[in-house]
Amino acid sequence: IRFHGRGGQGAVLAAKILAKALVVEGEYIKGVPSFGFERRGAPVAAFLRFDDHVIRQTTNIYRPDWIVCLDPTLFKTVDIFEGVKEHRGILVQATAKSMNELTIPPRIVKVGLCDAVRIALDVFGRSITNTIMLGALVRTTDVVSLDCLTSVLGEVAFRDAALDANVEAIRRGYQQTVVHTIPRRMLSDEETITPHV
């Protein structure tokens, strides 16, 4: 999984929370954050591998199966689809747009859309979308159970009121994500697709 976000949105923390939930559910994980001296708002990425076998590879993920994008404007700056595996990629995107308003490359076969910024402003009063997008990821992929994901929040990062707010954020992200499955057929990279809702 490759997480894309901006500094301050919590992409690295999102990967850490998901990693903990995956371990609880019996998976092996390997996480690699990727950030330098970027300021708040600059593009950042985090990488998370999981498997039912020990993972030895510790590099960045250049050919992701899944992409989680925490920011609806990031695609203007970063090619979030770079390296996505052909005809099996999954995109979980923070956006208020509908599927018909987005340009999705043909190598993506499933898309989860969540208006995470609106939810974040409602829950937190600012656009921190990481836990909301974890809920969206679970809705789109069933990678872990929703209960497991919310149960590890207190162990990884949050306490008291912040814990309650982030549990609500995950649940709302899960509930308000719209999942689209795109029919699998061989397409060239130049072709466009019409999604089925």
Put a short name on every predicted segment.
Residues 1-197:
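Active-site cofactor/cluster-binding pocket
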